[in-house]
């Protein structure tokens, strides 16, 4: 019954349907002062530690380009971030604008009931099919306990992903050829893979999209969906006119055109009412900010499973708070290191949404612990195994000042 009691206690502490407007660190009292909003209006609460786990993009402000004459379109224009179950795609002609993870996920799902789905892209992304069920996992579970199987399969996937990322960065042409050869095997030699599936950049300069069980390629082969690589001239009443002169008829247009980054979950974070500009600060171990007390944020991997890094971050924050309790101190703060500043952005990615939002994100430094490795093996040592106490992290109480 103990786990059930703990779950109930956690639920009592959870506050759903609350929006955090602002968070101010009060140095005199060593406390975070939060302004939150719920259905009853504004409220104020306090917290001794602030841990942001709201992701890395804005939920309320997606990236929506302004297409010429889009007001002339008579059908629905929908952004996936505002999707709802009332949208009926059955027997409709649908255009999905975009080529990223959202687009390649939506297209095969919608194609099951739609008359036809067109994925309209300005430029292609790398797309790789991946089985939804791991055959090795299925085999090992016949002979081994579930926990051992889970451990082995998890590390198999971690090491394989790390290896593929290493190969892509060091032998990009080889990996590029392998990916394109796999797509040609899926779609046949008569399909124009060079035009529709060959990006202008190298693998892992931007994220590689995974599609489960070749569902996107199956939709293309069955003519339930198609890919058009072109740029948009304007919207018309019944579809989209392209720069090539081609017109795509549509009942619904879905703008899978990307996200907008935010580093602080759209919260106005201040210290004694002075605004915290994340971009002017260094990231400490990829989860704290220089000069900001009792604060952490969860930012995962862009080149592997997001939750691998998120798990490490949660572990570290728990260890940190326990250490503060053990030491009997109120505060911990990464001390700003002027010698660590360089020109390195947090993530070396060329994706449009990263380039648009880098000025919101913290900087990474030129040495540990200010570097963001985006490498699970290195982070295990830096975050999980190494001691929390180091010369860059100051522990203190307000009475010490």
Predicted regions and their residues:
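Short hydrophobic core segments
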Residues: 45-58, 94-97, 232, 240, ...
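Glycine/threonine-rich phosphate-binding loop and adjacent beta-strand/alpha-helix elements that clamp
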Residues: 256-324
């Amino acid at each position: 019954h103990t786990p059930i009691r703990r779950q109930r206690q956690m639920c009592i502490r959870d506050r759903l349907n609350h929006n955090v407007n602002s968070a101010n660190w009060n140095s005199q009292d060593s406390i975070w002062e939060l302004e939150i909003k719920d259905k009853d209006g504004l409220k104020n609460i306090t917290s001794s530690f602030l841990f942001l786990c709201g992701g890395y993009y804005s939920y309320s402000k997606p990236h929506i380009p302004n297409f010429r004459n889009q007001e002339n379109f008579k059908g629905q224009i929908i952004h996936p971030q505002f999707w709802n179950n009332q949208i009926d795609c059955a027997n409709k002609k649908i255009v999905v604008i975009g080529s990223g993870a959202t687009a390649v996920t939506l297209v095969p799902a919608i194609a099951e009931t739609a008359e036809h789905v067109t994925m309209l892209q300005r430029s292609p992304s790398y797309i790789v099919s991946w089985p939804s069920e791991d055959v090795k996992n299925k085999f090992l579970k016949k002979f081994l306990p579930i926990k051992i199987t889970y451990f082995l399969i998890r590390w198999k996937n971690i090491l394989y992903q790390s290896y593929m990322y290493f190969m892509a960065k060091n032998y990009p042409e080889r990996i590029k050829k392998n990916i394109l050869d796999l797509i040609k095997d899926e779609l046949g030699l008569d399909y124009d893979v060079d035009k529709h599936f060959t990006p202008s950049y190298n693998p892992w300069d931007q994220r590689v999209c995974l599609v489960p069980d070749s569902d996107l390629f199956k939709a293309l082969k069955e003519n339930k969906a198609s890919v058009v690589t072109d740029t948009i001239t304007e919207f018309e009443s019944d579809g989209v006119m392209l720069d090539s002169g081609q017109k795509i008829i549509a009942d619904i247009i879905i703008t899978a055109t990307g996200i907008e980054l935010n580093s602080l979950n759209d919260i106005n974070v201040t210290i004694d009412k002075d605004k915290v500009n994340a971009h002017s600060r260094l990231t400490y171990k990829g989860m704290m900010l220089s000069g900001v007390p009792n604060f952490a944020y969860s930012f995962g991997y862009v080149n592997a499973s997001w939750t691998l890094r998120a798990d490490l971050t949660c572990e570290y924050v728990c260890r940190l708070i326990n250490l503060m309790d053990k030491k009997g101190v109120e505060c911990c703060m990464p001390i700003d290191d002027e010698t660590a500043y360089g020109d390195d952005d947090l993530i070396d990615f060329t994706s449009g949404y990263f380039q648009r939002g880098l000025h919101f994100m913290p900087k990474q430094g030129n040495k540990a612990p200010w570097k963001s490795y985006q490498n699970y093996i290195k982070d295990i040592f830096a975050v999980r195994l190494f001691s929390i106490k180091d010369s860059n992290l100051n522990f203190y109480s307000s009475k010490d000042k």
